[in-house]
UniProtKB/Swiss-Prot annotation:
This is Bifunctional purine biosynthesis protein PurH. GO terms for cellular component: cytosol. PANTHER family: BIFUNCTIONAL PURINE BIOSYNTHESIS PROTEIN ATIC (PTHR11692:SF0), BIFUNCTIONAL PURINE BIOSYNTHESIS PROTEIN PURH (PTHR11692). It comes from Buchnera aphidicola subsp. Baizongia pistaciae (strain Bp). Its EC number is 2.1.2.3, 3.5.4.10. Keywords: Hydrolase, Multifunctional enzyme, Purine biosynthesis, Transferase. GO terms for biological process: 'de novo' IMP biosynthetic process. Pathway: Purine metabolism; IMP biosynthesis via de novo pathway; 5-formamido-1-(5-phospho-D-ribosyl)imidazole-4-carboxamide from 5-amino-1-(5-phospho-D-ribosyl)imidazole-4-carboxamide (10-formyl THF route): step 1/1; Purine metabolism; IMP biosynthesis via de novo pathway; IMP from 5-formamido-1-(5-phospho-D-ribosyl)imidazole-4-carboxamide: step 1/1. It catalyses: (6R)-10-formyltetrahydrofolate + 5-amino-1-(5-phospho-beta-D-ribosyl)imidazole-4-carboxamide = 5-formamido-1-(5-phospho-D-ribosyl)imidazole-4-carboxamide + (6S)-5,6,7,8-tetrahydrofolate; IMP + H2O = 5-formamido-1-(5-phospho-D-ribosyl)imidazole-4-carboxamide.
Length: 529
């Protein structure tokens, strides 16, 4: 019986042929014999590499148009055999022991993303034999090295060079772990796709579908980040590979320093906020909060008005537009303030040339046709567990509103109320936003009491010498006491929009009537923590 620790035979069956030519040549140079499924053997042959067709070993052909290639007991015996215990069986049936199994699967994920393929075609991309062989090899890791990723090939060659064609048990266990994770992710992608396609789920089970009893979400590392929220924290960016989730940041960095954890967090908020508006709009984001949002005739004016909401807070912020950015606005930004990031659906060549002079400034182009509000769930980690909730970006429906005051809001106040809600829903609680003519006049956010948020919003407006006459105020949650209404009455604010729901709602409404302020109940709270 030969020493199974020394690599003698390798089985290869790959859909992704990346690096396989170089790897195969390295194996052959070490006098290692290659076995391969028909397609892989033909690919290697075209590149002047000989591999024995696995059917010559099994004496059984591939059948059913290739659906059955490796589902044969002789192949599994080659992989699952334990020489010390199975010596007689190995000799009796002339079993060739496979020391390395190199397998990757049919590209199901790629097929499932192809909108031109029918369900029946996509089903054909579900690999059966590949995952089965990988699991078998991983189970017998003490005797077999299983390799599922092309980027691992060179590390195997390096170890064999150092150890006379022997792979350590430590490496085998490591690769077996990677293999089981690979099969898990593969099966989960299939499950997520078929779940999405399943039309038999009753409408009343929407909650169970969104928040099932067992939740499996796969993430793949996209890139390491320089650090987390603070320099002492490590951080990476992972993308969600599960097919039942639609939230993705479709962005392209055109210039500037590498994106940080805080940058990406604020970009997420910036895209969510700007996607609320159809008309030309600019928003400025700072530390997880909008600090200025304005709609205007053009980018130049929208930026000016958004910036004037809070020039101090805008310093070092992220600026986002929903229209193509030209050189006029680019010059104004550079002249006006320091910014970490500028986002827009596109930039003119003249604007790019202006930003080129600021090489550290991050310029981000995003896909304007993607719905950045259309992600299914929010996830928060709590000591190893997670909290999961459906996202809060519900459509603002004025048909659900109740005008609870004697004074009715006019058309401008209704429009400003809608605008205000599109901003306040993205602010950290407790939050108050003041709006006039679809421009943020002032913002008070992240306070532990509603009256403090109200005081800050009014103070900032007064400090900037901005009149609050005919201004609309939006609150992310109800007013628990009438003290905020008393304060608001002295400012010139004429309309309040809030969800309602306090046990003191009647008292709050009476105060609004007392001060001749119109009040709208939306029945929709927007807490954000």
């Amino acid at each position: 019986m030969t020493n199974r620790n020394v690599i003698k035979n390798v089985l290869i069956s790959v859909s992704d042929t990346s690096n396989i030519i170089e790897f195969s040549k390295s194996l052959i140079s070490k006098n290692i014999k290659l076995f391969a499924t028909k397609g892989t053997a033909n690919f290697l042959k075209k590149n002047n590499i000989y591999a024995t067709d696995i059917t010559n070993y099994t004496n059984f052909p591939e059948i059913m148009n290739g659906r059955i290639k490796t589902l044969h007991h002789k192949i599994y015996a080659s992989i699952l055999a334990q020489p010390k215990h199975d010596k007689k069986t190995i000799e009796k049936y002339n079993i060739i022991l496979m020391d390395i199994v190199v397998i990757n699967f049919y590209p199901f994920e790629e097929a499932s993303n192809n909108t031109n393929l029918h369900l029946n075609d996509i089903i054909e991309h579900i690999d059966i034999g590949g995952p089965a062989i990988v699991r078998a090899a991983a189970k017998n890791y003490k005797n077999v090295l299983v390799v599922t990723q092309p980027n691992l090939y060179q590390s195997i060659v390096n170890e064999m060079n150092l150890n006379n064609n022997i792979i350590s048990e430590t490496t085998k266990l490591k690769f077996a772990t990677i293999a089981f994770k690979h099969t898990m992710n593969y099966d989960n992608n299939i499950y997520q796709y078929l779940s999405k396609k399943n039309k038999t789920v009753p409408k009343n089970t929407q909650l169970q579908t969104l928040l099932p009893s067992h939740l499996t979400i796969n993430f793949k590392k996209k890139q390491d980040l320089c650090y987390g929220e603070n320099k002492q924290q490590q951080a990476s960016w992972y993308t969600n590979t599960s097919k039942n989730t639609s939230g993705r940041m479709k962005i392209k960095q055109l210039q500037g320093k590498i994106l940080s954890y805080n940058n990406l967090s604020d970009i997420h908020l910036a895209l969510s906020c700007i996607h609320e508006f159809n008309k030309t709009t600019c928003a400025i984001i700072k530390h997880g909060n909008p600090c200025g949002v304005a709609t205007a005739k053009n980018n130049d004016q929208a930026y000016k008005l958004a910036y004037e909401t809070d020039p101090i807070s805008a310093f070092g912020g992220i600026i986002v537009f929903n229209q193509k950015l030209n050189d006029v606005t680019a010059r104004k930004i550079i002249k006006t303030q320091f910014s970490e990031i500028i986002l827009a659906p596109d930039f003119t060549q003249e604007a790019k040339k202006i930003f080129d002079k600021k090489p550290n400034l991050r310029i981000i182009k995003y896909d304007p046709n993607y719905n950045y509000l259309n992600y299914n769930i929010d996830i928060k980690s709590i000591y190893g567990d997670i909290l999961v909730q459906s996202n809060t970006n519900s459509i603002i429906n004025i048909n659900q509103w109740d005008i609870v005051s004697k004074k009715r809001p006019n058309e401008q106040e209704i429009n400003d109320a809608k605008f205000a809600l599109r901003v306040v829903k993205h602010l950290k609680s407790n939050s108050i936003v003041l709006i006039k003519n679809q421009i943020t006049i002032s913002i008070g956010s992240g306070q532990t009491s509603r009256i403090d948020a109200t005081k800050i919003a009014i103070y900032k407006a007064n400090n900037n010498n901005i009149s609050l006459n005919h201004t609309t105020l939006a609150s992310d949650a109800f007013f628990p006491f009438s003290d905020s209404i008393d304060l608001i009455s002295k400012s010139g604010i004429t309309c309040i929009v809030q969800p309602g729901g306090s046990i003191r709602d009647n008292e709050i409404i009476m105060s609004a009537n007392k001060y001749n302020i119109s009040m709208i109940f939306t029945k929709q709270r927007y807490f954000k923590h």
